[in-house]
Amino acid sequence: MLNDVGHLDCYVQHLTQICAEHPIHIEVDICNGQGAVIVPKGRHFDLALAERLSEHTLQEPLENCIQLDELVDAQKLMQLFKAVIETDQNIALFHERWQLNSLLAKSCEFYGQFPLLMQKMTVLKYEMPHLFKQALFCAYTSLAIARRLKANRDECVCVFLAGLIHDIGILHLDLELVTKKDEYTPEQWQAMQSHTQLGAKILKRIPNMPPSIIKAILEHHERYDGSGYPRAKKGMELGTMGQIIGMADTCLALYKRDLHSKKLGFDALLPILQLNPGIYCDKVFKAIVGLIKDIPWPMKRLYSDESMPKVVSRLLLTNEGITHDYSVLYGLVVSINPHLPKNKKSAMLRNMTQRIHFCLQRSGILQREHKEWMRAQKKEDYAAIERLEIMYAEIRWQMKQLRKLLAILWKKHQLKHPQLNQEIQKGLWQIEQYHRNHIGAKVH
């Protein structure tokens, strides 16, 4: 697939990055828009050829005309899963409890029926190994959830494949965006969200691709409460498969962000998941909670008793920041709500705000009693206090997404009255200044 003539498509750029170490050859004649052969089959693909092809409109997308000499095929994929199970303690505990070997083998065989997917997953492995590993985890977790829900074998293998390929649209995003190390701007965050639609578009061109998988790829960032994207769909509008993939993806994102560096088990996810039970449909939520609770996870402390006073001081400062941001953001949304246009971004904003509001009310972390409980610093409460670090990180992340959404509405002048746009600008500036002024006050 090429962009405008004269420019290398993002996916083709990935191919040019890997072709020196991982040979690619032309499997069928490449023809221009008029049907004339411009590159015969059998030739090796390289940067010079890619640049030459970029000057032409092709009859078939380039990805349909090439073959990677070393593919992550069904057999290789199964080997990679075995390696993950042997080396990752959390997945090993899951695997020992749920015995998914037979279903896993069938699922890998199903994946092997789609040559273009094998090509793209191979490129993902070489170009974005961290994302490829996440794809393995997401596929495995999705399969476990489907099994827990008593899905039949055909449904299970489809859920597995959707979990494996849910992020292939990222291969077609601008490389500068994908490789960015620091935080996305609101505009870049919005551009990244298009990977769901790109992924679904790719799958629609693949023969015999089950429609349920295409729908799941499109919906895996939608949320049951309407706070997701790309269409802010909610409730019964959403398919179960997309909810399963979304739940697995969320668990792995939370684990990578908040738990992996602390070497905690998946059981540490439970307090975070229970903050937002309405994000996913009830049966999917209960399935993942059941999967986690059925495993005897080893209990682990993060800090020594002697260091807990500093931990509590740091948490109290974090709590203060959450209270401040919530007050500003909630006040902003209440103020602009009657004037919001009727579109998907406005629906997302309302639903996300409501979710955060209920989350904070349910958790009780803004209550005086919560802070007094922390200040009491009873040794028997230390383990629970430690886990607040994870809960606070999730709440702060959710509020950061809300800030980005408000920034998009402001920068795109979605509000007709200039005073309302000024209110958003002022509120976002106020939050930024608060955190800038309090950096030095943090206790390490």
Enumerate the language-model features and the residues they cover.
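Histidine/acidic-rich helix-loop-helix segments that form or flank divalent-metal centers
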Residues: 163, 204-246, 260-264, 270-390, ...
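Membrane-cytosol interface segments
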Residues: 1-98, 366-444
